[in-house]
Amino acid sequence: MSTQTRSGGGGGGGHARNQKKSNASNSGGGGTGHHDGVSHAAAAGKKGGQDASKTDKPEKAQPKATTEQLRIAQITNSTTEDPQINEKVLLLLTMTQRSEEEVCCALNECDYDLEAAANFLIEELPQGAFAKYEKKRKNKAANNTADGAAGDGDWADGNGNADRREKSRNRSSNRGGTRGSSDSRGWRGRETRENERNQRESREPWSGQNAGQDRGDDRANDNYRGQRNGGGRSGPGGGGRGGGFVSRSGRGGGRMGGRTGGPRGDRGSGGPGGAYGSGRGGNANEDHHEVELWDNTIAQNAEKQQQAHDDAWGDWNNEEYEGSLKDSKVFTTSNLATQSAANVVSGTGASVTAVPAAAGTEISAPPGLEHQLVQQGSHLEESSSSGPAAVTPPATLSGSATTPLLQYSAAVSNPPPQLQSQGTQSGAGTGASAAAGGGAGSTPSSFVSASPDTFSSAASAAATLVHQAQKQQQLQQQTTPIKPSATLSVEQSQYFNSLASQGVSPGSVPVQSAPAGYAQNPVAAYSQTSTSVGVSQYPNTYANVFASGTAAGAGTAEQSQQQPQIRRARVKLPPPSKIPASAVEMPGDNALNNIGYLDVQFGALDFGTDDGFEPLPEKVGSGFSIDGQQQQQQPDDYQSKSQQQQQVTLAAGLQSSQISDALNAAGYTSRSTSQQQQGVSSAVNATIDQLTKSDPYGQTGGSGNAYQNAYQSSGASKTASGFPTTAPGGYSSSTYANVQSSVANSYQQQGYGSYQPSSYQQQAGSGAQSGTGAVSGGGGTATQNIPVGGSSSQNSTSGNASSAYLTSGYSTPQSAYQSSQSVYGNTGLSNSSGFSGSASNASSQYANFSASAKLKDATTASSAAHYDSVSTSSGVSSNSGSTGNGGVVSGQTGANQAAVSNNNSVSGSSSVSNVTAGVASGNVAGVGGGVSQSGVSSGVGVPGGSASSVGVNVNNNSSSASSVGAATVAQTATGTTAAVLASLTNKNTSSSNSSGSGGSAATTTGNASGQGAGASTGGVGSSSGAGGAGSGGGSGSGLVPTNIQMVSQYIQTGLPYYQQPVYSYEELQMMQQRVPHVQGYYDLNYPPASLGAGRDNLGSVTYSAMNDGRFARTDNNSSPVGNVSSTMSQQAGSSAPMLNVPYAYFYGGNVMPGSFQYGTPAIYPQIPAANTASGQQFPKPSYSAGYGSTSYDTLSQTTQDYSKGGYSSSVNQQSKTQTVSNQSQAGTGSDLTSSMYGKGHVALNKVNSYEKQSFHSGTPPPFNMPNTQTAGGTSAQPYGMYLPMPAAGHHNMIHQPIHQVHSELPLQVVVGGGTESHVLIHGNVNGPQVTYHRIWQTEPVQCQNQLVAAHCNNFEPNIDCCVHDNNNDLSFFAD
């Protein structure tokens, strides 16, 4: 293959081909004749060489292109390319799906013979041969030189950025051309010099490789190229890419591939320079096997490289890592499992062997190789043996397979010491330690540990990873499919690869293995995992995933994806330090969605660490999946055991055990059940209360433990356990609560935890409640765990959970509110205070909200309460408080309220509350007591059944039954009312607790009580079930209660984990500094203009005139001027004035009232100026004066902006003209002529418009939309999407409590038939049932005749079923 450098640039293409023919010729000459090219090559080579020779390699020294060269460049660089060539290029691009460089190169190579080029591309040119790996960085020097080189205008970029190259690639500079084009020559020479410098620099060490030939010498020699060509591969002649441009040809340097092949950065890396010299033109060498192997492994390379070069690894090179990456190899597992490592390796090995000198010669594991590395370690060994140094280190690796792999990698990477020391050792060490900790990981770790020194290089690490991954894979395959790994995205996998290369992976591997260890040493495993995780798990996980990816199916996917990447990774690997190992790889979207996944550490807690946090590994998925899943699984096993034990315990005390379960689920299980139980039972209430309030994070005590454990293990186990434990409620509550907890745990835990937990907790709580005792109490603990164990019940949650968060802060307030609420009871006040109560619940409010939401429905009975519940704040707190009223629950009025409270409570308390309510005082007391748990617990406080019932929630321990009991009690006490409320509650909250308890309560009563803990737990199960069901069932705890308003109207879906008011209070606090506080609803958020008010002025002033239409480019800004001051706008850009959302926008009850809109934060303060806000942009007076006002003149005059041009005159003049519309009048005749508006017109004179802002066609802006053309922007303030105001869901608040004959009835539908006699109320307590009475009068005609008869009005009498709701005085027809 001719090694010619493919350069014939564009037009020169043909020549280039010729050049190709002559190695010596410098293709650079481009078509002009390779002779020139040669001479150029020689000259350039010499120049470059000389420069290169100069070790100092002063760029300055680099010769500028000679006039001759420039001329040649000009000649060869035909900017206008033969259209046919473009067509051909496009055609080839389409046919071969190769990169433009490759296609252009091929065409050039093939003298623009389309068919030949296609064959060349497909048959000969390896995939990615031309992938541009280049350090953009080099361009700096290149640019400098380029700048120096006049002829290179195009190439001024020096490297001719790939982009540039591509652009200039016009055929003239088709990539090949660029390379070849003499023009490129100039730049190339520069670049070459630069590269040489870089290479020489890095390469200085390599100079020996240069074969003693100084690059400069080589360059100097025309032969240089020739050598490069001939020697090219071996010959340092390859000499830098510069030489490379020619020499690249060495590898077929013509094959741009070589040049491109090596990432330019590679070239730049100089190390590659050595590579050049040493092998295959090092660059290419480095970059691809292809150079080295290109001839014998082209097919393989093509496969490998197809994607390998697709990524712009060049970006890595952008890092200005100086130094040779040559040695660092990252072997990423690739899909080519099919290729036997041996084959690839052997091929590679052969090449390597052929060029043993370049131990560093990149031999990357072929894509398939990684998998097979272990298996075919022997081959690897062989190949690695060819690689001199590396072999030994691998030897240290414990596994023979590993050894080969490692050796292979080591040999390949033969990592430069720095890399070795940097990434691998630490990584490996970590891995080793981790592995050691991992236990299972130990195997990998042992080999890792053995290897850390050995693998110093990233490559080693990668190899290690691979090996580990394989082992891991086996382990995982045995232990668990690594779903998460499957989820890794290519990016992630690559990321992992890089991590692996950087040594992160080794640590991670152990982590993976840890799961096995985990099972063995659950605690250790967790800690290890946690620790490791904290340290490396997360990335490790990725790394694992990456590594295991190989092992795991995910790995496979990765591999397939990565397969191509192998080279890239290898070449690209930036020095570990360059790019943060943990760079910015974000977890997959799933992860992003889960705050919990962020490895944010609040306090000492690592949320992110516990994958477990999310029982759903899927979400954790890529990042955590391995750990998460394994943990989960183990936790499951673990849990199973624990659970089993606990279950045994359960028998003893369901609640405790449940709690334990919940805890177990939490993953506490590992902790002694007894602890958990203890903590749960004894500690739960107090602890939870305490925890929620005082020790949210520490959450010491059994609960605390549960909390943490749950947090830690909960993800997996919790979910598993808690989930199952609480199943119904448990799921959402546990899961969420736990998860939430874990997510929220520390974080949300409070803020949201309470909230969420509240709501979820309620649910969880419900679950917990459901889990009730266990969950609620214990589970609750678990759940509460986060929010507040207690919170398990919403109540507690509210009280506690909320408390937990807010409660801590707000609890008191909550209490206060609650008290108020209690006082108010159901009162909306409570509610609103509920809000505050919520506040107390803070989240609670959300929780309440959730609960409330649920509650609302449920709470139909007590509107206020319901509402309150909605606010829930009262709900929880209130609830308790309400509950107090609730005491009334008995069915007294209080009952309603209580019910409401329940609703609120429902969330946690609610049932308790209800129950508590049952015992009004008890309830309140309960609340106190409940407080511990939560208000719910308060319920506990409630003596007797109430207490029990409440107790259940609260105590859980006391008796699960309690909670249910409570509900039951409530029902019992209240009887129907309670039941109804409970039902409602259930319905609403689904509060699961409360409803569960409530609903269940009725049911549960016996159950809850009867079951006592069991029931609760289970019962909570039942109530939970009910409640849980309620939670599930009611609103579906997760769901927003039907009636409840969203906290944010936006949030229609499952309640968010945390309430999402438009602004959280914190945000508001932050916002307010910038945001003027409440303003008139529609007031602009920013000061209008000095003009102030005029609506026209308003927007317009602020904006420059409605330039928006033409996005006034102000000067530098293309975006429409915003409501930013002109100066600002120019810089800041502008946006339409933010108008508040129209009132129709519905803010949920919790949401800020619309009046409290946050204007767009005045980030850019509008500059109120004496002149218009626009300041210089717009003459201040102009608007006020009139669009045309003279003031404009002045202003514009003053304002340099306007002064610019016709505009200035037109604008200025406009003012003179004073008729804005015809600004042009004064402006210039031209203005008029140009447009009726005059140039000023936006549309008419875009140019001017852009230059200056003038009124939009001088017409006053419409309305106060600042930008005439742009409708008033919606305010930047994030207000939810505009939601037409939905009718508020039925809210208890809205209706006075429905007076129901039977409290059981959720609703009474009165069906009127004929006369009152027909009214039927369906008394079935179990469910809302409406009995419709057929209304057809027996004598419809008669009825018609009897127009007077009320029941016989023409309308109803003839309807089959007319249902008349007396309460609402509504009639409706039912089928």
Swiss-Prot record:
Query: Which residues get modified to Phosphothreonine?
Result: T673
Species of origin: Drosophila melanogaster
Q: Where is the composition biased (Basic and acidic residues)?
A: 53-62, 185-204
Q: Which residues form the signal peptide?
A: none
Would you tell me the protein name for this molecule? Protein lingerer
Q: Which Pfam families match?
A: UBAP2-Lig
Residue ranges annotated for the UBA domain, each copy included: 84-124
Q: What is its main location?
A: cytoplasm
- Quick one: a GO cellular component term? cytoplasm
Keywords assigned: Behavior, Cytoplasm, Phosphoprotein
Phenotype upon gene inactivation: Male flies exhibit abnormal copulation. They fail to successfully withdraw their genitalia upon termination of copulation so end up 'stuck' to the female, tugging to separate. There is also a 'non-copulating' behavioral phenotype. There are no morphological defects in the male genitalia. Females can mate successfully but have reduced fertility. Complete loss of lig function results in lethality during early pupal stages.
Q: Which PANTHER family match?
A: PROTEIN LINGERER (PTHR16308:SF13), UBIQUITIN ASSOCIATED PROTEIN 2-LIKE/LINGERER (PTHR16308)
> Origin, by domain of life?
Eukaryota
Q: Which residues carry this modification: Phosphotyrosine?
A: Y321
* UniProt biased composition (Low complexity): 142-161, 173-184, 442-453, 629-646, 750-767, 789-801, 869-882, 987-1008
Compositional bias segments (type: Gly residues): 228-282, 426-441, 768-781, 1009-1036
